[in-house]
From Swiss-Prot:
Signal sequence annotation: 1-18
Name listed for the protein in its UniProt record: Solute carrier family 35 member F6
Family: Belongs to the SLC35F solute transporter family.
GO molecular function: transmembrane transporter activity
Modified residues (Phosphothreonine): T365
Region (Disordered) location: 352-371
Source superkingdom: Eukaryota
Gene Ontology biological-process entries: negative regulation of mitochondrial outer membrane permeabilization involved in apoptotic signaling pathway; positive regulation of cell population proliferation
UniProt xrefs under InterPro entries: SLC35_F1/F2/F6, UCP036436
Compartments reported by the entry: Mitochondrion; Lysosome membrane
PANTHER family in UniProt: PTHR13146, SOLUTE CARRIER FAMILY 35 MEMBER F6 (PTHR13146:SF0)
């Protein structure tokens, strides 16, 4: 069945906005500008402020939900039910996980390459699978266990590529290792978030845009308030601002004033996460969760290719091998081999229900992509 123009538009929107989301965050990190009080030129390293911006983008999904609800007010068959019972506090625990995981990933993005950042996020499969067995009572089939093992192997190869790559003065080997480990740690938290959402949220049949928007609201408010104590908490060498504190939002705004292109990068990050979530949800609804997963894998290729073209990182053949192994692991875990085996076995009907399964991130993406 050929795709309609609308489906092609959604697929393109998801691919483009998902790529912009990671690349714009890395672009902002690469800028150098003076800070407040005439401080010397330094890198724009404000991961927690960037996380606040990401949650602002997710929060905008709530506005999109209410617009859809107003438009569908007179439609009895609409999926946006005005009378749907809803307790926003259900989203507080997942939002706290989202806030922690997102902040860790933005910190890690300052330390490692955009392509490694995107590839290592595939580790979420490992922890989601293990946690779903432990806390949701789910039984994984052989192909899912093989997918987890392949994902572990892929992560090792990608990490090895980072170790063997040439490192400039901006990204020392110790920083790259720390950044990669932070990304893995963040995926543990993201996996906890997904398990919490499945156990306590999905059974209430909350509209995905409302779910994303509500978590964005909690994350935006809580992390914005935390910026105040972060301004005073010393962080030593871990800090990227002149004052040596955990976060210096005032320094960030001064840098934006000195270099307006930083604002362009931040706006790109904020707007892209909103459109990416909308496009991802729509792709799952209009096409399938499998299609969404394939597009997310293509996004990694786009990010890697553009990072090479822009000179942000050096080419390393091991990254290709690592990405292919990660792709195989993701495909095995999510059952993409079943349609292929169905076609190979003559006359055997394809299992269409596998297309409709909610895969990892099937209803939302936690960082930049997600998630």
């Amino acid at each position: 069945m050929a795709w309609t123009k609308y489906q092609l538009f959604l697929a393109g929107l998801m691919l483009v906005t998902g790529s912009i989301n990671t690349l714009s965050a890395k672009w902002a990190d690469n800028f150098m500008a003076e800070g407040c009080g005439g401080s010397k030129e330094h890198s724009f390293q404000h991961p927690f402020l960037q996380a606040v911006g990401m949650f602002l983008g997710e929060f905008s999904c709530l506005a999109a939900f209410y617009l859809l609800r107003c438009r569908a007010a007179g439609q009895s068959d609409s999926s946006v039910d005005p009378q749907q019972p809803f307790n926003p506090l259900l989203f507080l625990p997942p939002a706290l996980c989202d806030m922690t995981g997102t902040s860790l990933m933005y910190v890690a993005l300052n330390m490692t390459s955009a392509s490694s950042f995107q590839m290592l996020r595939g580790a979420v499969i490992i922890f989601t699978g293990l946690f779903s067995v432990a806390f949701l009572g789910r039984r994984l089939v052989l192909s899912q266990w093989l997918g987890i093992l392949a994902t572990i192997a892929g992560l090792v190869v990608v990490g090895l590529a980072d170790l063997l790559s040439k490192h400039d003065s901006q990204h020392k080997l110790s920083e790259v290792i720390t950044g990669d480990l932070l990304i893995i740690m963040a995926q543990i938290i993201v996996a906890i978030q997904m398990v919490l959402e499945e156990k306590f949220v999905y059974k209430h049949n909350v509209h995905p845009l409302r779910a994303v928007g509500t978590e964005g609201l909690f994350g935006f408010v809580i992390l914005s308030l935390l910026l105040v104590p972060m301004y005073y908490i010393p962080a030593g060498s871990f800090s990227g601002n002149p004052r040596g504190t955990l976060e210096d939002a005032l320094d960030a705004f001064c840098q934006v004033g000195q270099q307006p292109l930083i604002a362009v990068a931040l706006l790109g990050n904020i707007s892209s996460i909103a459109f990416f979530n909308f496009a991802g949800i729509s792709v799952t609804k209009e096409l399938s969760a499998t299609t969404r997963m394939v597009l997310d894998s293509l996004r990694t290729v786009v990010i890697w290719a553009l990072s090479l073209a822009l000179g942000w990182e050096a080419f390393h053949a091991l990254q290709i091998l690592g990405f292919l192994i990660l792709l195989i692991g993701t495909a095995l875990y999510n059952g993409l081999h079943r349609p292929l085996l169905g076609r190979l076995s003559r006359g055997r009907p394809l299992a269409e229900e596998s297309e409709q399964e909610r895969l990892l991130g099937g209803t939302r993406t936690p960082i930049n992509d997600a998630s």
